[in-house]
Regions:
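Macrodomain-like recognition of ADP-ribose-binding/processing modules
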Residues: 3-142
């Protein structure tokens, strides 16, 4: 077997990899159905429960939660703080790495992650900055 034929499975995989993440203004189940080649990120909580806000798409097979909040309620214990920065970063990295491992093109909400119900910029600004830097890397806006 010649070297090109031997390397073709690897090369084919590289050439077929989606390039860069994209943003979309709003998600719907129909939109996700129309794009099975993409993985749609949404702001999630540590309990992986609730369907409010971006999590309305939670149960769709092309949706993937990125934890930005402790629980799906409005009490003080539901929100992250920078007191747990290292743990917050670990969860963000774990979720983003799992999304990237799918090999699908990543779709990020135009409004961002951690920007709505999670209130990261107010309650955990260092965590918010870290998450935004990771998202900018995915978008190629370093």
């Amino acid at each position: 077997m010649n070297p090109i034929d031997a390397a073709w499975p690897t090369l084919k995989g590289i050439f077929n990899q989606p390039r860069g993440a994209i943003t979309m203004p709003w998600y719907s189940e129909e939109l996700l159905d129309q794009h099975p080649d993409k993985l749609f990120l949404f702001g999630d909580n540590e309990m992986r429960r609730g369907r409010g806000g971006q999590a309305a798409i939670r149960h769709h097979p092309h949706a993937h939660g990125i934890r930005t909040k402790a629980a799906p309620h409005w009490g003080d214990s539901a929100f992250w703080s920078d007191d747990n920065y290292d743990e917050n970063v670990r969860m963000i990295d774990e979720d983003l790495d799992a999304a990237l491992d799918t090999g699908k093109q990543i779709v990020i909400p135009e409004s961002g992650l951690g920007t709505g119900r999670a209130r990261l910029s107010d309650l955990a600004p260092q965590t918010h900055e870290y998450l935004q830097s990771r998202l900018q890397e995915l978008l190629g806006d370093e």
